[in-house]
């Protein structure tokens, strides 16, 4: 009753193919497990499905098995598709034991098996290159670099994920393999050997030799990375002309060429020196590990390098050493360059944050904040925001706030509140942080606050109003941001040290050009009622007048912002008197919102609907209102007789039960044909009707 043997050929039906794949994959893994347990051997199985998914089984650590494979001298037995083309089921393992001749078979089979091995080494190479090669160098060569270790690990999953489709490409490229392989054998391995010994000792010096093999593939990359071209001279040996050919192959069929290159080491392994070449292959893998470093690094700065990265992954086979050599070239100069450059790029946001924080702390120290200012601009977003800042630069102190606020308004202002010794300003500024965030948007959306200031200024100076209107029209949004920011900066500077008020006045004098009207516009907002003399005092930039006007302007600006943002904040203590005098405009706005919640709280308690207040709701109106709506329910719910009553009704319901036994009473009760039923059954029918209706109601209610 032997099983029916099927013809071994590609299955065209997708459904049948998927089912066969699942069943045979499971059987293969099961067989591998049984083999590993029964014979105490290590087994690793890789399957790259047509869906580009990787399936694997390993009796132990997959990476260890792959590393062992890479360092192994050569396969004592190798099987290829041609060995099983007889059409017999693979289940018959009898024939498998005989071919220890495969070593000579390897020698003989290799020329044909560049195609045959195309799939074989791809499987093997797929296996070890994606996962094994990165782990090996990560453990050994990368420690000197240190950078590559995590990066080497990161590309591994990519290597694993990508190989599936690329394996197919490699299979397609198998004919290309023999061409690439001899080149790799002649050149790649010789250099790889040199690479092999030294890389473990000193990776950076070996980078140039790696660079030498690298140039074939890096040439396309060298235009991207000029530093690499100097390294190509290291390999200028005849290898380079062959390597350009390899480059073409890599470009056209990098995956394919690399696969044959890998294959080349496999055919020689039976020979002793070729085994050594494999060992040499493994070190390039170490260097390939450097390659993984490049892919993360390069993508940071050079998107162009990212396409070669897929090539690296495509190269997953030992040719990766080729790519890896190339990459090491890029790695040494570019790694340092990329690492140095991308590191500043990556840390820049962090450094910028730190710098901004330091600037916030340094804002009292104007020169320090300025260099930091120069640092944040390099990122484009910061540059845009710094562009807003330059007009405020004449005011040295406000600049940090502008830059910081442009980047991060909250932390600096918070720090302002922290550094400022003002008692109440701390809390106010901390509260204003949210207000300031809302303010720039609200100010941008609504310049009426500025119009208020202009209207107030009308009493002070009409010419200044015209200039202010022009300024508003020219750039209302940036000055708004700056205005909101200078408030915090001025408040922190002027209030923090008493000697500081002079610098704010200086900043006002410096801002005398276009920004002066802006500052004046904001300041008279508070002091408009106090008198136009305050604005003139600021224009005069007297130290005392400047200090008082700055403090008041801060408070009023904050008040205006609060009025716009509906934020309730107390005025700063130092300017409390001025605020009280000007209280008609600014201060009452913040106090008004506070007081309404305080006073209306009782008012709301009185005016609030009964539903809002449970006590009153229950005591006064709740019970009577339902009584008015549902008198029956009130009697039932309030009397507490409803509980027993439903029980009592339940018994009559039982009585109605017999009526349901097709007595006419229940039919009458259900259909409510009272006139007929009443005439027939008299008052008894009435009772069951009422009883039946009531208990039903009770049930629905309950």
UniProtKB/Swiss-Prot annotation:
Asked if the Swiss-Prot or TrEMBL record annotates the protein with the keyword Cytoplasm, the reply is: no
Q: Where in the cell is it found?
A: Nucleus
The superkingdom listed in its UniProt entry is Eukaryota
Q: Where is the composition biased (Polar residues)?
A: 180-195, 456-465, 554-567
Q: What segments bear the compositional bias annotation Low complexity?
A: 145-155, 273-284, 326-343, 350-371, 487-512, 530-553
According to the record, the residues making up region (Disordered) are 73-608, 658-702
What cellular component terms from Gene Ontology apply here? Answer: nucleus
Subunit structure of this entry? Answer: Interacts with MAPK MPS1.
**Protein purpose:** Transcription factor acting downstream of the MPS1 MAP kinase (MAPK) cascade during conidiation and plant infection. Required for overcoming plant defense responses and the differentiation of secondary infectious hyphae in live plant cells.
Q: What is this protein called?
A: MADS-box MEF2 type transcription factor MIG1
Species for this entry: Pyricularia oryzae (strain 70-15 / ATCC MYA-4617 / FGSC 8958)
Give the lineage.
Eukaryota, Fungi, Dikarya, Ascomycota, Pezizomycotina
